[in-house]
């Protein structure tokens, strides 16, 4: 049986990235909550060269 988590940086960024969050009202609320909480990372960050 195939596992449910098949890591891919592309799909990770496309679904949970900062720009995607900012694109909708609810996404902006997520960012706002994380800022208020003092999170170091507001959204997923994929290491790039």
From Swiss-Prot:
One of its GO terms (biological process) is translation. Transmembrane segments: none annotated. Pfam families: Ribosomal_L34 (PF00468). Keywords: Ribonucleoprotein, Ribosomal protein. Gene3D superfamilies: 1.10.287.3980. GO terms for molecular function: structural constituent of ribosome. One of its GO terms (cellular component) is ribosome. Belongs to the bacterial ribosomal protein bL34 family. This is Large ribosomal subunit protein bL34. It comes from Trichlorobacter lovleyi (strain ATCC BAA-1151 / DSM 17278 / SZ).
